[in-house]
């Protein structure tokens, strides 16, 4: 339903509101309070003053830091976006940020930013190198089917057992060993359960064979009555035959 007060245009449609005209408050785009507080405490602890480490940030000071940092980063990104746009690029790189600092008259921050950037890049390089060292070379000539994958995993496990000194800290190998152990335990438990079920079925069959089938008591009574009636009929026939003989 359109907002109150809107009227249809000549085409019979309601005009759509312009999203660019929507006002955005600075409180909606503030940086996380914990991040800003951690950075501020690191700066205070890094200072040479003795009482700086015991300083506490007030609530109003934290709000001021959050808002000022948001405005600073927004202004810096605007300058960097203009530089990348002038060079015909759609992405912003590290050099654009350094040029934006110089253009925004914050040249004093450039040495500190370069130092932090070099530390960050070195950490990323070390992380990639450590990750590459952990990778195990795959054996050649192995298909990608599930059965071949299992054989490949088993081969890798044999290699890892032989070269335990080199592959001791490999988390992928430990995970593969845990998975194989779990599968083996599941197979053992399934076999035990199937054996127990078969034994229980055999015991039930033996009990059924050994037990005598009990007859219905009503059927027994009816059978006894039929037998008595048959005996009485036989006695009557004998009596009639004896009387005929006497006559």
Curated annotation (Swiss-Prot):
Pfam (any one): Histone
Compartments reported by the entry: Nucleus
Residues forming coiled coils: none
Superkingdom classification of source: Eukaryota
One of the protein's GO biological processes: DNA damage response
Span list, region Disordered: 128-247
GO CC annotation terms, alphabetical: CHRAC; epsilon DNA polymerase complex
Keyword Magnesium in annotation: no
Keyword Plastid: no
Any one GO molecular function term: protein heterodimerization activity
The entry's keywords: DNA replication, Nucleus
Subunit text: Heterotetramer. Consists of four subunits: POL2, DPB2, DPB3 and DPB4.
Primary role: As accessory component of the DNA polymerase epsilon (DNA polymerase II) participates in chromosomal DNA replication.
Further details from the record: In eukaryotes there are five DNA polymerases: alpha, beta, gamma, delta, and epsilon which are responsible for different reactions of DNA synthesis.
Protein name: DNA polymerase epsilon subunit D
Organism: Debaryomyces hansenii (strain ATCC 36239 / CBS 767 / BCRC 21394 / JCM 1990 / NBRC 0083 / IGC 2968)
Organism taxonomic ancestry: Eukaryota, Fungi, Dikarya, Ascomycota, Saccharomycotina
Gene that this sequence comes from: DPB4
């Amino acid at each position: 339903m359109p907002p109150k007060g809107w009227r249809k245009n000549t085409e019979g449609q309601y005009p759509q509101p312009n999203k660019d005209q929507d006002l955005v408050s600075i409180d909606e785009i503030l940086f996380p309070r914990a991040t800003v507080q951690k950075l501020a405490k690191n700066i205070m602890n890094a200072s040479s003053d003795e009482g700086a480490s015991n300083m506490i940030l007030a609530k109003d000071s934290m709000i001021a830091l959050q808002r000022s940092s948001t405005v600073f980063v927004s202004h810096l990104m605007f300058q960097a976006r203009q530089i990348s746009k002038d060079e015909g690029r759609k992405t912003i790189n590290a050099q654009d940020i350094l040029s934006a600092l110089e253009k925004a008259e914050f040249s004093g921050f450039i040495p500190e930013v370069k130092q932090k950037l070099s530390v960050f890049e070195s950490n990323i390089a070390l992380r990639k190198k450590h990750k590459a060292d952990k990778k195990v070379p795959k054996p050649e000539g192995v298909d990608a089917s599930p059965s071949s994958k299992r054989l490949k995993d088993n081969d890798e496990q044999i290699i890892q057992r032989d070269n335990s000194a080199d592959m001791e800290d490999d988390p992928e190998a430990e995970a593969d060993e845990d998975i194989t152990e779990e599968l083996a335990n599941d197979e053992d438990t399934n076999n035990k359960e199937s054996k127990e079920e078969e034994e229980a079925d055999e015991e039930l069959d033996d009990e059924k064979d050994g037990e005598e089938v009990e007859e219905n008591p009503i059927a027994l009574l009816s059978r006894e009555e039929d037998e008595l009636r048959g005996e009485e009929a036989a006695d009557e026939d004998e009596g009639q035959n004896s009387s005929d003989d006497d006559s």
